[in-house]
Regions:
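ATP-binding glycine-rich loop module of kinase domains
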Residues: 13-70, 74
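Conserved alphaE helix
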Residues: 102-116
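C-lobe/activation-segment region of protein kinase-like
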Residues: 141, 145-228
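A conserved short helix/loop substructure at the end of the activation segment
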Residues: 224-239
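Regulatory extensions appended to serine/threonine kinase catalytic cores
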Residues: 238-246
Length: 246
């Protein structure tokens, strides 16, 4: 993979695209390319040489370019690996979609793509609204690649923060204790869908039961939110596919 070299001073000329997560900032390197730069304080916790190798391995999996913003180039700042460049997409986050049928179609695609990614031994460890963009054809695009585990390499870190406001989405942390990452990611997607159904003006259960979801889907959503006996063996991808095609 091509490498770019910058001096720390040169970064001041780049516009800040957004503040990114706790681990770094995202800078606008070119109109279509972003630069993900890691903060120095997390360096002791990450094996950066390992991350560099992981990104090289990941760049070979170019089949997923329409789904994921792949790392394009490694970036060295003051002769130290400090980030990578990635493609900038003209898209909106899933929060911008209000139509229920479009949401069902989107989440059906998300579940299908998540299966595909997992079959490539890739784990999406940061499934949340701001990391999922939607293009003009209602196709999902995952944009957070820096936390992924690839093949024999583990994730660099695991976000152990709260799943979100209990008032808007279920507190799903307690449901994660005995699940593998694939199940966890599917539940995170289900949480996002439940959150999309909810609003602050109406109880979540009313919002679900007043929607045009099928009876089966409504019962699954209700059980997921309110029951500790949720059936984790449910084929959630099939549920969304049935909703999309019925």
């Amino acid at each position: 993979m091509e490498e770019l070299n910058f001096k720390e001073e040169e970064l001041k000329g780049f516009k800040e695209f957004n503040k990114g997560g706790y681990e770094g900032k995202i800078l606008l390197y070119k109109p279509e390319i972003l630069l993900k730069r890691f903060e120095s304080f997390i360096m002791p916790f990450l094996n950066m040489d390992n991350k560099k190798y992981k990104l090289i391995e990941f760049s070979k999996m170019n089949q997923l370019e329409n789904i994921i913003a792949l790392p394009k180039q490694l970036v060295n700042i003051d002769n130290t690996f400090s980030g990578f460049t990635m493609k900038k997409y003209n898209a909106v986050t899933i929060d911008n979609l209000k139509d229920l049928n479009k949401n069902i179609d989107l989440f059906a695609k998300l579940f299908k793509n998540l299966d595909y990614l997992h079959n490539k031994d890739i784990i999406i460890g940061d499934v949340k609204n701001k990391n999922i963009l939607v293009d003009n054809n209602n196709n999902p695009i995952f944009v957070d690649v820096d936390s992924m585990g690839i093949n024999k390499f583990p994730q660099d870190h695991i976000d152990r923060g709260p799943a979100g406001s209990v008032r808007r989405i279920p507190n799903i942390n307690k449901k994660f204790k005995s699940l593998d990452y694939k199940s966890l990611d599917k539940l995170l997607l289900l949480s996002l869908f439940v959150e999309k159904l909810a609003d602050n003006k109406e109880p979540m259960v009313n919002k679900i039961y007043n929607s045009s979801l099928s009876k089966e889907a409504k019962e699954i959503m209700h059980e997921y939110i309110y029951s500790d006996k949720f059936n984790y063996n449910i084929d959630l991808a099939a549920v969304f596919e049935n909703e999309r095609t019925r």
